[in-house]
């Protein structure tokens, strides 16, 4: 009996089943990995949360039309100037090929979508830049669409809300691209002089000529958390000033801390915030007559 305690355990036998070489296919896009916290989540759950990570709050990129759908009242959006597209004014080699690829990738004709809509019944003109199209760089068409949208807001006496996301001026259009900085800024100024309300919401990334022109000209200047906002790149600035910059330099949190933003708002709270601001700025007719449309 004692000998049984010291007997060697019997080895288990395992059978090897040959593989046929095939792998179970997981449908593409069903899961998304957060680049910030590295957690993996169902894409549908991420979309339900407005593309904001459930674990760390990272704001994933979102297309222009998807952003409009999540903000405005259902069925209220009426797009304007949707057919405008660049004509390659400088004859830049392969520029139109790149434009066509971006059209197919994004489903847009240009890097911005503009139109009329309502948020909780409050009317507005809205413009949303889309970084999938030439990194939302500002060329002549982008500048023209912003200009026309602001003019529409002025004529219809509606607030103007713009979401920025851009790599800057579009180099393939040269000076015509740079001219849009002055053109859009002048339109903002004229609208402001007429008493119009402008709200800018800077998203990741808002850089270059866009950040240096209309992006910060709103009556309210907001940003999404973690957005990169600045003119020149971090490395260029460090080499110029010969100083090491803070870790959070050029982030929306850094700008808020230094008084360059009015607020840093989560995408989850943005609709309520905009609705409240629009509601308190509604222009009502004056007693005994209509309000001055100028």
Swiss-Prot record:
Q: Which cofactor does it need?
A: Zn(2+)
Which GO molecular function terms does the record list? acetyl-CoA carboxylase activity; ATP binding; carboxyl- or carbamoyltransferase activity; zinc ion binding
Q: How the cofactor binds, per note?
A: Binds 1 zinc ion per subunit.
Location relative to the cell: Cytoplasm
Keyword hit for Transmembrane helix: no
Q: What EC numbers are recorded for this enzyme? A: 2.1.3.15
Q: Which Pfam families match?
A: Carboxyl_trans, Zn_ribbon_ACC
Q: What is one GO cellular-component annotation here? A: acetyl-CoA carboxylase complex
Which InterPro entries does its entry note? AcCoA_carboxyl_beta, Acetyl_CoA_COase_Trfase_b_su, ClpP/crotonase-like_dom_sf, COA_CT_N, Znf-ACC
Which pathway does the database say it acts in? Answer: Lipid metabolism; malonyl-CoA biosynthesis; malonyl-CoA from acetyl-CoA: step 1/1
Q: What residues does Zn(2+) bind to? A: 34, 37, 53, 56
Organism domain of life: Bacteria
Where in this chain does the record put each CoA carboxyltransferase N-terminal domain? 30-294
Q: Which intervals hold the zinc fingers (C4-type)?
A: 34-56
**So what does this thing catalyse?**
N(6)-carboxybiotinyl-L-lysyl-[protein] + acetyl-CoA = N(6)-biotinyl-L-lysyl-[protein] + malonyl-CoA
Q: What class of enzyme is it?
A: transferase
Q: Name one GO biological process term.
A: fatty acid biosynthetic process
The record's keywords, sorted A to Z, are: ATP-binding, Cytoplasm, Fatty acid biosynthesis, Fatty acid metabolism, Lipid biosynthesis, Lipid metabolism, Metal-binding, Nucleotide-binding, Transferase, Zinc, Zinc-finger
Principal location listed in the UniProt entry = cytoplasm
- Similarity section: Belongs to the AccD/PCCB family.
Q: Subunit arrangement?
A: Acetyl-CoA carboxylase is a heterohexamer composed of biotin carboxyl carrier protein (AccB), biotin carboxylase (AccC) and two subunits each of ACCase subunit alpha (AccA) and ACCase subunit beta (AccD).
**What is the stated purpose of this protein?**
Component of the acetyl coenzyme A carboxylase (ACC) complex. Biotin carboxylase (BC) catalyzes the carboxylation of biotin on its carrier protein (BCCP) and then the CO(2) group is transferred by the transcarboxylase to acetyl-CoA to form malonyl-CoA.
Q: List the protein's name.
A: Acetyl-coenzyme A carboxylase carboxyl transferase subunit beta
Lineage, highest ranks first: Bacteria, Bacillati, Bacillota, Bacilli, Bacillales
Gene encoding the protein: accD
